[in-house]
Amino acid sequence: MIDHAKETAKETAKEAARALRRRYFPLQDSLIGMFGRLLRRSNLVREHIAAADPLKDSGRAAIYVHFDPDGQVDDYVVHQVSALADAGFRVTFVSNSPTLPHDSRARISAFCKDIIWRFNTGYDFGAYKDGIASISNLDRLDGLLLMNDSVYGPFRQLREVLSRLDGSTADFWGIADSFEYQHHIQTFFMFFFPAALQTPAFGRFWARLPYVNHKPWVIRNGEVGLSQRLYRAGLRSGVLAPYWSVAEKMKARLEDMKGNAPPQSQQPGFARFQSRILGNRAVNPMQYFWDILITDYGCPFIKRELIQLNPAGIPFLSRWRAVVASRSEYDTSMIERHLQRLDRRDGHDANPAVISP
């Protein structure tokens, strides 16, 4: 049997340690940012390639960020880029890969305005920065979407998802929001209305953002910092699945399980998972709430890292195929092929969540 009291005590101690570390983040981030600014470059573009540009007259632009250690463009990426074009976006494809062969470029060229191949300095936010800098009419756009390949999907038509956008109530919008560090919209899929694009705060944020190769810094100053900068400018955010609404649904599910615990609740890590949710700790919604997001909120994506690595030890993850199939006809073999290729490349055994139906 799992000792829930012991797991709760461990989680409380870990949270106290995390809170102590957070006290030093501002100083650490200031020093890292200062160093990044000393090495300031206008961009890190290796090559700018014209593509088919099938939507020349579209007023909506998308920056799609890609990384693959071998420079391959997998089927799930082609599916995403074509879905953006189908939804009316003029796509700039930005790859941080160490190489980008011609056959990879050819796979997505028909759906894109252009392709930017760059050095992987600054990670996704460095790529977003260079992609945005390539758009000459930014302040005249009807909307800008930032998206990256850290998710699988979409499991639904993006036009349907984006039909929920309402520029009268929000200036920028995303699939999920988070309270880790500070409140922010998660940037794997983030849309900006003209009110956001035209505010000086938006341009200043990207102009001043240094290229930094330190992932925690990029999360705190890129992902979190972007939303916080826009909030300070008086802009409003919207989201498909509001954090506390989703969290309350998960809490209700866990409370129900207390009286009728299924055998799976004895899985290692379940007590820790339960403690974090019922203790109202800020968690990553795309990991902790992944299934409710898909089934109850129509979330069209699942995080790649969740299936590949499951870093938070989320229980019941082997259900991911069934959950996706319950709401979509998405071809999950695209996910399996991609992750099995990476496992073979790295010489690892495939994650059971990938190979076990």
Located regions from the model:
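ER/Golgi luminal nucleotide-sugar-dependent glycosyltransferases, focusing on the catalytic module
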Residues: 2-357
